[in-house]
Curated annotation (Swiss-Prot):
PTM-bearing positions, type Phosphotyrosine: Y795
All residue ranges annotated as the Ras-associating domain in the record: 779-866
Annotated ranges, domain Ras-GEF: 367-629
Record protein name field: Ral guanine nucleotide dissociation stimulator
Pfam family, one: RA
Comment text on domains: The Ras-associating domain interacts with Ras.
Ranges for domain N-terminal Ras-GEF: 112-237
Gene: Ralgds
Lineage, opening ranks: Eukaryota, Metazoa, Chordata, Craniata, Vertebrata
Native species: Rattus norvegicus (Rat)
UniProt tissue specificity: Expressed in all tissues examined.
Gene Ontology BP term (one): Ras protein signal transduction
Length: 895
């Protein structure tokens, strides 16, 4: 290997530059042998070498090494050395035989590279042109993708046109400085119009777009950019007012979907009775799942009530029409042309009762592969419409604030679809009260098979929704039903559930997403030969629909863990680069979704849209009607578990530190089944407490809670969201970015592996620089703080440093929970050690050192029961028992 370092003429910013005067030229004739030759009139040749046993061992050092920072004209540059290969290297045989020559060696040039780390808004905008001219196109891409987090479209245009507003429309010298400047600005504005045209959708006057048109007319008359700008303006002006979303409601308008009833149906597939579920031989019943340490944990989950009318466009099955290439995806889509009449299906249409529930399990008449394909079609269409920068933590975390109810509608649509799939699973399992346990078990088996088909199609969103619904309290507690489920189906259910295990920050689901994100087919362990043979026979290349919640939590974590500004007023652009790494993964997976080739099936779509909705209270009540609570004791749930399955699940368990003697044993057993339906909260680790009354609120309004584990006696359940720092995951809802945890003790051993760690070592390039949840890294950590209420209890993540005292942390938590009218002195901070023990943080203590670092970093912000000057009796212990006196009980409310 040859490595050369030399002084050259200075290059443009962002490109290669000389290291320093008198730099040495070195030749590495082997990986561990370096020959340095000094410049004339300097030191002689110096040879450094040692013996390396295997010449094929990879080089350990990175190709890029940071050496410092520079502050130039209000911009902080990160300085690094980067090795650039000049010629291909020698082959393995050449090196072993020693017949390599100068041309066969690896030639590297070490260059000095400057990248923008932070700067003022004016400097960041001004740097767009030099970065483009210096071949640092990544800067332009990152800026256009993330600038909405720290400025507006109007401000960027004003600063750009102010700085570069004197371009001569006709350059006297072809290729001269003026011509290069004009080409750079034209390329930047053209990229902006093509990729983010929704930024200019500001009805009714479209001021930003008209400003751009005026600038282009003056400086680039007759150019292609002028034509495209005029075309976009004409298209936006032709849209109806209702089709254009005001910028005040959302950072960028998105595709407006018409209700399904207004869209023409697509041709239906004629399914013969042979594809319906046929009678199968009697199989040995499977054991009822006792998931004390359930691997299906939704890492970025956040429970949301049903969609409000303005945000309730049902996902349609009509294929998305093609858009003009000059029009952004934010424009309104018209329905597709009327297709030919659909063929009549070979099964009866679903019958419904007065309450909207299915009277018969017509699900069994739809083959599992058909159901999975239709879910994948719906999920893929919605995921492709997601506006990636809406996932930014600074935008997504604002959705619950007043006036932001319509923020990020494309993400809300994916949330609604996830809820609808989970609701469909629960409704088909519980809706028909006349079904016997054996019939209901066939429905459960059918859904497990649908989940398997979703895995084959790499649809991690619906796969996760189905598994979450099957592990909801309402279905999990049905002992008799699970006893009738075949052992083979139950093993498949377990295997699929392991995909979303929260071990090592959901590393398995993240690795699968990296491995299969852009691959042609899924790599399966369950019947791989049969599946791969079927995939090859069809010859269809598949896309990937991820669990979007993983990306949302990663981006919210980044937004919380990294500062927006450095040194007071300099925008932290390094933070935007890391955010773009996640957004780029979303865009890549969106492109992969174009590989799906699935025909919409009209009758399944009509059946799915007509499915009634069950609230969490309704689903639990129906479950109790099928099997009264007294018959669902947790001790009987494991009665028919085989030894192998018991051992398999016990490996995920650890001895419990305390056992509950509560009479509601069945609810606590179900509480071990940690199900969390979807999506990251606005503040990294928001969680929601649910009670049997069925009322709830959340930081996101969309998630239906009908498939949430529910306690019949009103015992509080807390569902934790994932706080993963980054994910390669994508897809709409990353495979498993949310986690749930029960606040009540369990009658069976509780898993000690649920440490809620949020490390993604080896998965993301920026994970090592972020603090981990449930771990103190350096002088900071992230805690989750909730209000001391029973209903609608939302967890907010707080970044705590070693310098933060209790009043500071309390104020941060109050700001997150919108308690602006109260004073920090009115609240106290308690760490949840266990169900019955809480650690009170002293008034002026340093939270970082006062907290119990061995327990979960979960805190409660509790209003003081006494005035600050009143005398309060404290026990000798630092822990506080749960207060049950009526006089000390704090009023409960929905926040």
């Amino acid at each position: 290997m040859v490595q050369r370092m030399w002084a050259e003429a200075s290059g443009p910013i962002g490109g290669a530059e000389p290291l320093f005067p008198g730099s040495r030229r070195s030749r590495s004739v082997w990986d561990a042998v370096r020959l340095e030759v000094g410049v004339p009139d300097s030191c002689p040749v110096v040879l450094h070498s040692f013996t390396q046993l295997d010449p094929d061992l990879p080089r350990l050092e990175s190709s890029t090494q940071e050496i410092g920072e520079e502050l130039i004209n209000g911009v902080i540059y990160s300085i690094s050395l980067r090795k650039v290969q000049l010629y291909p290297g020698a082959t393995k045989g050449q090196r072993w035989l020693g017949c390599e020559n100068e041309s066969a060696l690896n030639l590297y040039e070490t260059c000095k590279v400057r990248t923008v780390k932070a700067g003022t808004l004016e400097k960041l905008v001004e740097h767009l042109v030099p970065a483009f001219q210096g071949s640092d196109l990544s800067y332009v891409t990152v800026f256009l993708c993330t600038y909405r987090a720290f400025t507006t479209t109007q401000q960027v245009l004003d600063l750009l046109f102010k700085r570069y507003g004197c371009i001569l429309p006709y350059s006297s010298e072809d290729g001269g400085p003026q011509d290069q400047l004009k080409n750079a600005i034209s390329s930047i504005l053209g990229t902006w119009l093509d990729q983010y045209s929704e930024d200019f959708c500001q009805p009714p006057d479209f001021p930003c777009l008209k400003q751009l048109v005026a600038y282009v007319q003056l400086n680039m008359p007759g150019s292609d950019l002028e034509r495209r700008a005029h075309l976009l303006l004409a298209q936006l002006e032709d849209l109806e007012p209702s089709e254009v979303e005001p910028e005040a409601l959302s950072p960028a308008p998105v595709l407006s979907l018409k209700p399904a009833s207004q869209l023409e149906p697509a041709p239906a597939l004629l399914l013969t009775p042979s594809r319906a579920v046929a009678s199968t031989p009697v199989r040995e019943p499977a054991p009822v799942p006792v998931l004390a340490s359930s691997p299906v944990v939704a890492p970025a989950s956040e429970l949301e009530p049903a969609l409000e009318p303005p945000l309730d466009p049902e996902p349609t099955l009509a294929p998305a029409p093609e858009l003009d290439p000059t029009v952004s995806q934010s424009l309104h889509l018209e329905p597709a042309p009327v297709p030919a009449p659909a063929l009549e299906p070979s099964w009866p249409l679903p019958e419904t009762t007065e309450n909207g529930l299915c009277a018969k399990p017509h699900l069994l008449l739809f083959p599992p592969d058909l159901v999975a394909e239709q879910f994948t079609l719906m999920d893929a269409e919605l995921f492709k419409k997601v506006v990636p920068y809406h996932c930014l933590g600074s935008i997504w975390s604002q959705r619950a604030k007043k006036g932001k109810e319509h923020l990020a509608p494309t993400i809300r649509a994916t949330v609604a679809q996830f809820n609808n799939v989970a609701n469909c699973v629960i409704t088909t399992c519980l809706g028909d009260q006349s079904m016997k346990a054996s019939d209901r078990a066939r429905v459960v088996e059918h859904w497990i098979e649908v989940a398997r088909e979703c895995r084959v199609l790499k649809n991690f969103s619906s796969l996760y929704a189905i598994l979450s619904a099957l592990q909801s309290n309402a279905i999990h507690r049905l002992k008799k039903t699970w006893e009738e489920v075949s052992r083979g189906s139950f093993r498949v259910f377990q295997k699929l559930s392991e995909i979303f295990s929260d071990e090592n920050n959901y590393s398995l689901s993240r690795e699968l997403l990296i491995k299969e994100g852009t691959s042609k087919f899924a790599t399966l362990e369950m019947n791989p030969r049969r599946t791969q043979r079927r995939q090859k026979e069809t010859g269809v290349i598949q896309g990937t629909v991820p669990y979007l919640g993983t990306f949302l939590t990663d981006l919210v974590m980044l937004d919380t863990a990294m500062k927006d500004y450095l040194y007071g007023r300099l925008i932290n652009f390094e933070k935007r680069r890391k955010e773009f790494e996640v957004i780029a993964q979303i865009k890549l997976l969106q492109s992969a979704c174009n590989n799906y080739s699935i025909v919409p099936e009209e009758h399944f779509g009509a059946w799915f849209r007509a499915m009634g909705r069950l609230s969490e209270a309704e689903s639990y009540n129906l479950s109790c009607e099928l099997e009264p609570p007294s018959e669902s004791a947790s001790n009987t749930l494991r009665s028919k578990k085989s030894t192998a399955i018991v051992k398999r699940w016990e490996r995920r368990q650890a001895p419990s530190t305390e056992l509950s003697t509560s009479s509601s044993a069945h609810s606590k057993s179900c509480d071990q089944l940690r199900c969390s339906p979807y999506l990251s909260s606005g503040d990294i680790t928001d969680a929601l407490s649910v009670h049997s009354a069925g009322s709830s609120t959340s930081d996101v309004e969309e998630i239906n809670m009908s498939f949430v584990p529910e306690s019949p006696d009103g015992q509080e359940k807390k569902f934790w969201e994932s706080a993963s720092q980054s994910s390669p995951e994508t897809s709409g809802i990353s495979s498993a970015s949310s986690s749930t945890s029960s606040s009540s003790a369990s009658t069976t051993p509780v898993s000690t592996t649920r440490t809620h760690k949020r490390s993604v070592s080896g998965v993301c390039s920026y994970s090592s620089s972020l603090p981990l949840y449930n771990q103190q890294v350096g002088d900071c950590c992230i805690i989750r703080v909730s209000l001391d209420v029973d209903n609608g209890n939302m967890y907010k993540s707080i970044l705590v440093t070693s310098q933060d005292k209790a009043p500071t942390v309390i104020r941060k938590a109050m700001d997150k929970h919108n308690l602006d009218e109260d004073e920090p002195e009115d609240y106290e901070l308690l760490q949840i050690i266990s169900e019955d023990h809480k650690l009170k943080i002293p008034e002026n203590a340093n939270v970082f050192y006062a907290m119990n670092s061995a327990a979960n970093y979960d805190f409660i912000l509790k209003k003081r029961a006494f005035t600050k000057g009143a005398k309060v009796k404290h026990g000798a212990s630092s822990t506080l028992p749960r207060m049950k006196q009526k006089g000390l009980r704090i009023a409960r409310g929905i926040f």
